[in-house]
């Protein structure tokens, strides 16, 4: 075996139709099915199962006992061809589950790049997760949830199906959201999460200056503190968006809501 050949434990079971790039590592008792592609530099730990159709990019790490690309947990699923697509440099800790899409929901579940999904995270069918997200232990996304970039979800938090969580949002421990969470927003730790301000600390860590954060806070106060009906708040946000691309991003998110906005 050459140095750059896949390194596969003798107890692993790899379907002949699976395609593993150079230097992929596969741990003990792992199962990789047909129609699975795994990019270079990826490490699949012990006791994992990966089912196709699944496409996995470069330099990902599956620590152990992860269940990847399984059939969607949707009674309407009738065996149609659907897929899971994972980007690059993600880390999936113990017992993470990622399901493929459904025919009625677009047929695809997607995970972006540079995400960190901790133990027992579940991402259901037809979800779309962006880049640089952190999902703490037992994070649960129901079907059709969309998560923007740089979102942090704390332990035992979850999102109702079809919800959207905007970029840079933060969900506290145990928060359960049944509505859309605007970008930059913090959601509280009560049983039904409610907005609790702006994720200021996270924005500072990502290089947002005081002027940008101030504009976002003003928009938040307009939306959540001023007591305005949503239609009136949107009028004021439209004015504020002229001077702030971040406020414009919030307004665009609100305008495209399919579920009620979390308020």
From Swiss-Prot:
Q: Which UniProt keywords apply?
A: Acyltransferase, Cytoplasm, Lipid A biosynthesis, Lipid biosynthesis, Lipid metabolism, Repeat, Transferase
Question: Which is an annotated Pfam family here?
Answer: Acetyltransf_11
Coiled coil residues, start to end: none
Kindly give the InterPro entries that the UniProt entry links to this protein. Acetyltransf_C, Acetyltransf_C_sf, Hexapep, Lipid_A_LpxA, Trimer_LpxA-like_sf
Q: What EC number(s) does its UniProt record assign? A: 2.3.1.129
- What reaction does this enzyme carry out catalytically? a (3R)-hydroxyacyl-[ACP] + UDP-N-acetyl-alpha-D-glucosamine = a UDP-3-O-[(3R)-3-hydroxyacyl]-N-acetyl-alpha-D-glucosamine + holo-[ACP]
Q: Does the keyword Transmembrane helix apply?
A: no
Name the Gene Ontology molecular function terms of this record: acyl-[acyl-carrier-protein]-UDP-N-acetylglucosamine O-acyltransferase activity
Fill in the subunit field for this protein: Homotrimer.
What family does the Swiss-Prot or TrEMBL record give for this protein?
A: Belongs to the transferase hexapeptide repeat family. LpxA subfamily.
The name of this protein is Acyl-[acyl-carrier-protein]--UDP-N-acetylglucosamine O-acyltransferase
Q: Per the UniProt entry, what species is this protein from, by scientific name?
A: Stenotrophomonas maltophilia (strain K279a)
> Species lineage, top-down?
Bacteria, Pseudomonadati, Pseudomonadota, Gammaproteobacteria, Lysobacterales
Gene responsible for this protein: lpxA
């Amino acid at each position: 075996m050459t140095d750059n050949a896949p390194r596969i434990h003798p107890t692993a079971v790899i379907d002949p139709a699976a395609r593993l790039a150079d230097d992929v590592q596969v741990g003990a008792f792992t199962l990789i099915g047909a129609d699975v592609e795994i990019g270079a530099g990826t490490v699949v730990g012990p006791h994992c199962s990966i089912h196709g159709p699944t496409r996995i990019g470069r330099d990902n790490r599956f620590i152990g006992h992860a269940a990847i690309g399984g059939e969607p947990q949707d009674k309407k699923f009738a065996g149609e061809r659907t897929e899971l697509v994972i980007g690059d440099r993600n880390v999936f800790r113990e017992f993470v589950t990622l399901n493929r899409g459904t025919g009625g929901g677009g047929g695809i579940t997607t995970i972006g790049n540079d995400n960190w999904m901790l133990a027992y995270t579940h991402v259901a069918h037809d979800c779309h997760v962006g880049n640089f997200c952190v999902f703490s232990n037992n994070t649960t996304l129901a079907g059709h949830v969309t998560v923007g970039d740089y979102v942090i979800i704390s332990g035992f938090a979850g999102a109702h199906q079809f919800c959207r969580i905007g970029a840079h949002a933060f969900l506290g421990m145990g928060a359960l959201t049944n509505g859309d969470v605007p970008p930059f927003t913090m959601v509280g730790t009560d049983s039904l999460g409610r907005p609790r301000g702006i994720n200021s600390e996270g924005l500072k860590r990502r290089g947002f200056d005081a002027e940008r954060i101030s504009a976002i806070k003003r928009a938040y106060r307009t939306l959540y503190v001023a007591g305005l009906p949503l239609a009136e708040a949107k009028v004021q946000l439209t004015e504020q968006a002229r001077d702030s691309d971040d406020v414009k991003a919030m307004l665009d998110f609100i305008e495209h809501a399919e579920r009620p906005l979390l308020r």
